[in-house]
């Protein structure tokens, strides 16, 4: 069975819908709330599924919002519509299942059963084992600079389904709506949608594998990487 059929299965779509409803969240550019989403899907489910299957579905741009960071700056988020969040979640679920089997044990961000506390616990274990030197790596503006072609190339190694990859690319290129103006997204994965966190882990898994290949001790949470050594 092709991955797109797994994504579009009733069970997977229902699971994705329930996840989006449970997370609540703001509406996107179309103004449709999570509370209104169920009725919309019931009326349009067949049309939505058909358009996703035959590649005619067009995601709406994300709505740009900013949230304050601890350093006084603001973090840009992109809020997809409630429907697009559901579709993204439906894509993210089976892709996460595929990659969970190959992701590094030292990657802790946005993975089921893992948290920042686990990443901190791993770092403390390194210190207790005598690793006194620490290098903290924060990949500057990582989410804004992800190369779309490179990401699709990496995904293709495990996702052998052109319809699914085409849909993911559409979400990467969906654009951003800010102050009434739509801007194209040439690079990056806007933070705020279920797909962005999965794609970021897939992209950075190459870094994890390189660190492991070099025999380095590390822990990674999203785009924050901590490496340790004795000297």
What kind of region is each of these model predictions?
Residues 1-42:
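Non-catalytic, polymerase-adjacent accessory regions of viral genome-replication enzymes
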Residues 7, 81-82, 229:
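Conserved residues at beta->alpha junctions
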Residues 16, 87-88, 144-146:
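Short helix/loop capping segments that flank catalytic or ligand/cofactor-binding pockets
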Residues 16-20, 90, 167-172:
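Short alpha-helical scaffolding segments that buttress acidic/His motifs in well-ordered protein cores
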Residues 27, 31-101, 110:
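Active-site substrate-recognition loop segments, prototypically the cytochrome P450 B′-helix/B-C loop
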Residues 51-66, 70, 105-106, 110-230:
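Conserved polymerase palm-domain catalytic core
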